[in-house]
A protein has these predicted regions:
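Helix-loop-helix module between adjacent transmembrane segments
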Residues: 12-17, 46-63, 67-131, 194-198, ...
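Membrane-water interface regions at transmembrane-helix termini and the short interhelical loops
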Residues: 31, 58, 97-109, 122-144, ...
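Hydrophobic alpha-helical segments and their helix-loop junctions in multi-pass secondary transporters
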Residues: 95-120, 125-129, 148-177, 361-368
Length: 368
């Protein structure tokens, strides 16, 4: 429980929930055509922002409790016990996904072995997980949060004012992906674009910042505002992906050419539209976003475990005791599962948690 300024809390919340989601997800989701833009807008306004606001606000009302405990208060002890395990597994998967993604991108850019970057990122994650929130996260994350916003605004400026790109018009609900039978809109679009529309992972991050707010009045601009901001970022990247490759058909061809690697496509877009120097800053921003979501995922997992075990977290030794098994599990996953499998499990668990959170919010409001 470390009080911080509302602006700083907002920027940290935005960075915690964003990660690679509002960049990679919309680029891949744009394969489905302009309907992806519709999903981001409707999903965010009517589901995602509501989900994020209430999960954060209820954490404030329940004195900073984590999402499994809040679920337990409203849906019963059995669901709470299941959610404890479910949330911790999801958070470990998030942490691992956001190790493998940036490590692979850094390896591609530098030519150095990806395992070196995995080791460096894991070491940083461990420090950020066990240290108080104001020591690392509170100091550098607001800077990264500003970088994320400026990165998206730079792409938007090119999209609107360069005169080179035209955003495809929304004319039908047609599935524009290359293989529509294998990848139907329902449910694949809704797991491809999660961050920017609705993501259960956000419910695990909101309690981190709920413990840093000065009053309940700050909850709406922080939690609702951060989700709206993430949705705008997602819209920008989905729009530039479609405009850059002249529609969904061109984007499908580009995906095939680059082997489905969204990181490579971000690099191509950035270098072409912004130039080498600014493109380097964009890639740095993408890597930073992924890493800053990964470390707070492990931090959230530690807090959830500490809550249900009843362990106070003032002692550094106890924080280390809880963190070691979590990181050991993460290492096992990263060495035993390919990235595609990790991402598939994460995508399913992420939206399942979002469903449970909305169920819990409905029960809470129904009681009142």
């Amino acid at each position: 429980y470390v009080e911080m300024s509302p602006t700083k809390v907002f920027l940290i919340q935005l960075l915690n929930i964003a990660g690679l989601g509002p960049v990679f997800g919309p680029i891949l989701g744009a394969l489905y055509g302009p309907i992806a833009l519709l999903w981001v807008v409707i999903g965010c306004v009517f589901a995602g922002a509501v989900h994020d606001y209430f999960s954060g606000m209820l954490s404030v009302r329940y004195n900073g409790k984590s999402v499994p405990d809040i679920v337990g208060y409203n849906l019963g002890d059995l669901i709470k016990k299941l959610m404890r395990v479910f949330a911790v597994v999801l958070l470990i998967l998030v942490g691992v996904v956001f190790v493998a993604g940036p490590a692979g991108l850094l390896s591609q850019l530098t030519g150095m072995h990806s395992m070196l970057f995995v080791a460096i990122i894991f070491a940083y994650y461990f420090l950020a997980t066990i240290l108080p929130v104001d020591k690392i996260i509170g100091r550098i994350y607001p800077v990264f949060g500003c970088a994320l916003l400026f990165m998206a605004l730079g792409i938007l400026a090119v999209l609107l004012f360069s005169g080179k790109y035209t955003i495809p018009e929304f004319t039908s609900l047609e599935n524009c992906i290359a293989d529509p039978e294998r990848f139907p809109i329902l449910p694949m679009l809704f797991t491809t674009i999660a961050c920017g529309a609705i993501s259960g992972f956000h419910a695990t991050q909101s309690p981190l910042m709920a413990r840093c707010l000065r009053s309940e009045r700050q909850a709406r601009p922080v939690f609702y505002g951060a989700m709206i901001s993430e949705s705008i970022i997602a819209l920008i990247w989905a729009a530039i992906a479609m405009a850059f490759w002249n529609g969904a058909s061109g984007l499908n061809a580009a995906i095939a050419e680059y082997g489905g690697q969204a990181a490579v496509m971000v690099d191509v877009i950035a270098r072409t539209t912004l130039g080498e120097v600014l493109a380097g800053l964009v890639i740095f921003g993408v890597v930073a976003c992924a890493i800053t979501s990964g470390d707070t995922a492990f931090r959230s997992a530690r807090l959830i475990v500490a809550d249900f075990m009843g362990l106070e977290q003032r002692s550094l030794r106890k924080r280390i005791y809880i963190s070691i098994p979590l990181f050991a599990a993460g290492l096992v996953i990263i060495f035993c599962l390919p990235f595609e499998a990790m991402w598939s499990y994460f995508a399913w668990m992420n939206q399942t948690l979002a469903m449970v959170t909305l169920w819990m919010l409905t029960a809470y409001l129904n009681k009142r």
